[in-house]
Amino acid sequence: MATLLSKGYNIIVFGRSAKNESLEERISRLLQWFGIDSCLDQVTCVDTDLSQDNLGIPTGEYSRLCSVVDSVIHCASDTSFSESKREKVMAANINNLKGILEFSKNAHVNFFHYISTAYVAGTGVTYCKETLSSVKTFTNVYEESKAEAEKIISRFCEKNSICLSIIRPSIVYGDSQSGRSLKFNALYFPVRSAQTIRDIYLNDILNNGGLKAAKNGIFIDKEGYLFLPLKIYLPHEGNINIIPVDYFVNTTIKIIENCSSNGIYHLTNPFHTTMKIIAKYYEQLMKVNGVEIIYGPMPDDLLRNPVAELFDRFIKPYRPYLSDDRVFDRTNTILATDNLNPPEFTYDIFKTCMEYAIKVNWGTSIFV
């Protein structure tokens, strides 16, 4: 949104109030964070309920909005992975499509842009094409819901002669230049988990005599590094496909502005990043030794130390994405963006992003 406003676009935001804060207040706060609060007059905020007829908008206002909108960007979704939240995820990502699709038809929009995920590719696939997914098995309910949503939207847009772009990012992290981010999940979660474990034992050593740490083979070495015996088992060799948010934004804008017909676009990284690389970066930044990435099944009789057990619990939802062997076709994206590529994930980028995350306490102090 910020980039579109900076380029002079007028935007109508469909959304909801949250936590005793109106939609207008939420958007105003975001624009201040982006440093473009002067663009507030380019934004019209409309309280909506995607589950209601006419999106819960009064009839007269609904008709007026239909007369002024020429494109829709749909990015609302429930990103929960947990199977226990299946009903909620399906309601948000599939059932709630009806209202926004009907609005698009009634408004006779030229384009419908859908923000999906590269992981609609599902499991058991090694080469992922920029086409609708036909697989039946997925890592989690989020992937499944987005794959089904793509098909529903595609059928609807074809039936109603609406051009459709489906934009499929992989895992998005903060700005590669500033480190700034509004969310700290995915890539951040393993790092935050390891930092939390480090701090528990560092505090024990510095303030409580270090008995708990010593019992688990944890100590501060002669170079001042914390030795933290953490073996991370991953099922097989593979990569974690990550892109910075600035690449995601710039690529999405180019696709929106340049595409003239239907298309599916993978916003993924051709440069390989492994958990071994991230573990090395983590050790360097956090002054830790002892983190080991092991590819292959965990032995049944392996006795896990408390450090490893705690880390395993923390990262369980994200484990399938940490050693991914899928390759994503980027032909459409390259053509639509003049071969715009994301940067390789260097230590400097990692350091910048993680230092910002720590500065804002992993998101709890962003707006303070």
What do these predicted ranges mean?
Residues S178, L187-Y247, T251-K254:
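A conserved pocket-lining segment of Rossmann-fold NAD(P)-dependent short-chain dehydrogenase/reductase
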